[in-house]
Amino acid sequence: NLDCINFPMRKTKIIATLGPPAEDPKILIKLLEQVDVIRINLAHGTWDKRDPDNHTDKIKNVQKIAKTIKKPIAILVDLKGNKIRIGDLIKQTIDLKKDSIINVRFTDERVARSIDEIVVNAGYVFENIEKEDIILIDDGLIKLLVNETDDENQTLACTVQEGGLLSRRKGFEVIDKVITKSGLGEEDQEDLRKLAALNVDWVALSFVNQASDVNQAREVLSSIDNQMRVIAKIERLSALKQLYWIIKASDGVMVARGDLALESGPGELTGLQKTIINQTVAGKKIVITATQMMESMKTSRVPTRAEVFDVSNAACSGVDAIML
């Protein structure tokens, strides 16, 4: 009985991340009939119109079908931000076995050369990594221990501590080290202009550290006379120190639990989520809870009890939307 919760209940919206199956118009229609917002992540796919997975077509298809079914569907797009990601693998996926050796090479090349190699297109990161550092990939699902560093070839020889199936473009982090740059890069600024031309409703800024990051996006939009609304993704502990000002500068915030948990540890995440939600609600701004909500339904038709509780708890906490 939710009436026992001493909190003004809201009609929590559903945000759905657009995946490859939704490229089928029939599936996309069914999806749009059930959700309120479609989210597109610019970290996956390209702007190249020759690419069937290009961003422009995805956005226009959603807008076209929403108009056809006469349902107002908002579009939320995540900018890439400065998050470090691995490049393309030599195969669609590789199976990293526990205790096996994998090389991480920092290079401008976008594709790995072999089955036992991962590439990262951020050379400056190599200088910050040392022997015995712990690397986390794909929100910590893959865990590597750095055994050796090869300065000449900018390569790390690593042992797989936690393995599993790995696919391309997954996030790359190093425990206890900040390797992402703050602010809006040139590519993000250009992407913002493209999204404005496509009449996107919301943009989510990745790895916001301070209010000036949000203001920078506002300045870009203002220069082209666009009023797109801005969501600040809270993914860094450093952002919590500036949370009041970030909330004030933005139209809303997203509790991006994947990267936030990597910094805080899973034990602290519940309290941090509550803090972010409460402060955002108090500031009368939009708040979204994201990452691994109903995650098991990628492979199961029924969510786990823990997932049901997670979604219900977020709704009871006063979030405006949950993101799948």
Give the location of each predicted region.
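Non-catalytic helical/linker scaffolds that mediate oligomerization, partner binding
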Residues: 2-324
